[in-house]
Amino acid sequence: MAFEPIDLEQLVTDMKAAASGVLKMDVATLRGFSERQLKAIAQQASLVATGIATKQITEETEQFFLDSLEDMALSFVRTLRGLLMVTIEKVWNAIVGVLWNAISKAAKVVLPVPVLGN
């Protein structure tokens, strides 16, 4: 069994392809989620502004509506953070999978591929 050196350029290309595949798929999901959520938050802000301007929202209830907007924004950001963390794990898993497979092939051994998040 002869050692088979790793083609570094190919390895870099394979890692980029693995990461890009995950990112393209997840970016579409993130983009759709973000667009819907931000539109809903913007619409709510518009309703609050109209309510304040027309006095339908009183001084007594104004803070309640503003706090609700803050909560919507915080919920959006927290959900986005969670989705991004999942995407980062997927990218890490894809890159490590490529690396471990390249090492296994070059060294003619079978290495168990670690998985982040398990």
Task: Label the model's feature ranges.
Residues 1-118:
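Cationic, hydrophobic amphipathic alpha-helical membrane-interacting segments
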